[in-house]
UniProtKB/Swiss-Prot annotation:
Residues 1-21 form the signal peptide. The keyword Protein biosynthesis does not apply. The modification Aspartic acid 1-amide is found at D65. It comes from Conus leopardus. Expressed by the venom duct. Residues 52-54 are annotated as: Ser-Xaa-Pro motif, crucial for potent interaction with nAChR. The keyword Signal applies. This is Alpha-conotoxin Lp1.4.
Length: 68
């Protein structure tokens, strides 16, 4: 292979690596956002459950804000 062909092959490999890396990052960001949203919902459910029990809400007044 000539020097020109090797340069073209190198650029194609770099381009392919960049495209794969970019799409992988976007997919990972979407998965992280979904996991974060699910965790937030689970935490909210746990706090609501705690606030409905007098003993738990008494220990965690900063979370329950006086509601039961």
């Amino acid at each position: 292979m000539g020097m020109r062909m090797m340069s073209i092959m190198f650029m194609l490999v770099v381009l392919a690596t960049t495209v794969v890396s970019f799409t992988s990052d976007r997919a990972l960001d979407a998965m992280n956002a979904a996991a974060s949203k699910k965790a937030s919902r689970l935490i909210a459910l746990a706090v609501r459950g705690c606030c409905s029990h007098p003993a738990c809400s008494g220990n965690h007044q900063e979370l329950c804000d006086g509601r039961r």
